[in-house]
């Protein structure tokens, strides 16, 4: 069979175009396809929600790929093992309450299962603003990451979502944008994004699940973003809290949409 280069191009453009149009109005839009964001998306999709994710980088997975200092092993605690088991990620006991998993297997497996659950992931797209109606966040303003990097003057497009989840990690990008540009008050003690604190694994893992919740009308936070918004510590290369955080937000949104 002779291959037609133009037909290959047409197939890619038509398929992506249709996928993007379908993503312009969804139940939940998640910014950041790290472990917390993907876990949140997976459990929402399993509940029948229409979910789309936007990841500014070429690859998904956030900082999980590199484990600790590029040693591609990651640690989970006992209470997160059930999530690993559900995804089919192999883990092994290091000592009581400390489980190890291969970081590459973990990211690739979670990503695969998330997409197969029905989630659409768009990489190389950044959220540069939020859409607000009646003091509630109800969508995202999107542009290619390459436009931002090249500092080109190119207008973005907008999509609508019943709920938006900020899973952008340490930067808490969506929450900071909402605070800075809209004047929406965050549900923190200061009404603002407080910024993450220095390393303390135990406290960070305990607070990350507690802090994963609605931070402004229509906007939820999960993963390291939650601790950045609420001023809690970072936790380093232990990832149980990330998965538990994403699952919690998925359940809260599902309960709200019932």
Where are these regions (language model features)?
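Extreme N-terminal leader/targeting segments of oxidoreductases
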Residues: 1-28, 143-144, 192, 197-201, ...
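Glycine-rich FAD pyrophosphate-binding loop
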Residues: 29, 45-65
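Glycine-rich Rossmann-fold phosphate-binding loop(s) that bind the pyrophosphate
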Residues: 32-36
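Conserved FAD-binding subdomain of flavin-dependent enzymes
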Residues: 43, 73-94
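Feature captures the FAD/FMN-dependent oxidoreductase FAD-binding
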Residues: 88-163, 167, 173
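A conserved FAD-binding loop/helix module that cradles the flavin
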Residues: 229-257
């Amino acid at each position: 069979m002779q291959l037609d280069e133009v037909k290959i191009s047409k197939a890619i453009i038509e398929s992506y175009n249709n996928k993007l149009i379908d993503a312009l109005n969804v139940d939940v839009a998640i910014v950041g396809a790290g472990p917390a964001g993907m876990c949140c998306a997976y459990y929402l999709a399993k509940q029948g929600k229409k979910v789309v994710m936007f990841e500014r980088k070429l690859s998904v997975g956030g900082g999980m790929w590199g484990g600790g200092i590029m040693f591609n092993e990651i640690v989970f605690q006992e209470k997160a093992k059930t999530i690993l088991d559900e995804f089919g990620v192999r883990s092994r006991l290091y000592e009581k309450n400390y489980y190890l998993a291969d970081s590459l297997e973990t990211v690739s497996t979670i990503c695969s299962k998330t997409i197969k659950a029905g989630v659409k992931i768009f990489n190389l797209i950044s959220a540069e603003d939020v859409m607000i109606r009646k003091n509630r966040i109800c969508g995202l303003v999107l542009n290619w990451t390459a436009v931002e990097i090249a500092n080109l003057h190119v207008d973005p497009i907008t999509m609508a979502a019943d709920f938006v989840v900020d899973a952008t990690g340490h930067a808490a990008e969506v929450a900071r944008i909402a605070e800075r540009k809209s004047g929406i008050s965050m549900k923190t003690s200061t009404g603002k994004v407080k910024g993450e604190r220095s390393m303390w694994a135990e406290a960070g893992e305990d607070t990350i699940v507690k802090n994963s919740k609605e931070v402004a009308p229509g906007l939820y936070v999960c993963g390291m973003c939650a601790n950045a918004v609420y001023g809690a510590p970072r936790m380093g290369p232990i990832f149980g809290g990330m998965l538990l955080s994403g699952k919690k937000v998925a359940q809260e949104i599902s309960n709200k949409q019932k």
